[in-house]
Structure formats: structure tokens, C-alpha cells
């Protein structure tokens, strides 16, 4: 192409820059029109904050492939993003990280760095109940409030329920008779006493 451009059009051809494919981790194949495996921005925005998507592109050289992760690799990506963003805010980031962050940050408002892994793990335990999440965060020494984790809460819930449902904690809708029938007499009595105590008395979440 370079020779043709020069000899026929007397024009110096532009330098070719090849781009690697973007992978889809947690799914089979690569993102390509020829394979029919494509992701829309709307799909990615169900699990990624916009800045994290831009960060993945900004930190990757054109000739280096990277993955959009639908498996637990996404938690590592959020962790790495948070680490770089924190160093950027604190002024300890090197020039490379500063350039990346300047390329991917969209708004002047600061991003709330509530760990995505915590939202997934703890959110699953309390069924993503906001009040209970705030209580649990306070109990473990990280008193995040809803205003701080609201931007990521829906993303964490969507990812867990749609991309990693096998890791979700679910309360049984009915009694697990299989387990109950394997209990001995003392164990069944203990379960009955616990049920009676909880049902006949009112307890706050704090007391429990």
C-alpha cells in the first residue's frame, strides 16, 4: 500500500497501526464482527462504570490484547483501577498513570472507591439491602454510606446475578427437608427453640 500510494498518487502513506482483538473472559471467543460475538456499550455498562471501560482502553497498548471480564476477573480490574485512581488523587502516581487517568476520567466529581469485591460478597449475604449493607460495613470498620456505594451497587448486583450466579448466597424459600431429616433429636430441638425465640421476640438488626 505504501508503494502504490507513492508511485500512483505521489503520496506518503500513513503509518499502519494494527490493533489487537478485545477478548471476552468468561465467555468463549473474541469480540469480532466476523464471529458474530459482539457486546454493546449497554451490555458492558451493566457491569462496568464508564471510567473503568475507558481505563481498560487507555492503559492498553494498541498491539496488546485485553479482556472484558464477565467472570471474577472483573473484581481484579476494579481493584487495579481503584489503586491507580487513588494514587492519582493522592499525587503519588507516575506520569504513565497520570496520563491514563487523564484519558479516562469523565467528570469532575470524584469516584467513590468502595471495593467492588466487598459489594459483591456482602451484598449477596444481605440480599443487597441498603440499610443492612451500611450496618455490615460499619461493623467491619469501613462505614461506607449509600451515597458512597450507590454507583456500584447495581453493577455488583447485576454481575453477581447474571454472570456469577453460582457464587450468590440465596435464602431457601422453603424448609430444607433433606437437611432437617438428617438432624438428630437434640439438633431439631435446638432449631425449634431458636425459631420460637426469634418469632416471639422483636430484635433489631443491631441486637442480632
Positions of predicted regions on the chain:
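Catalytic adenosine-cofactor/nucleotide-binding cores of aminoacyl-tRNA synthetases and other
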Residues: 5, 9, 19-168
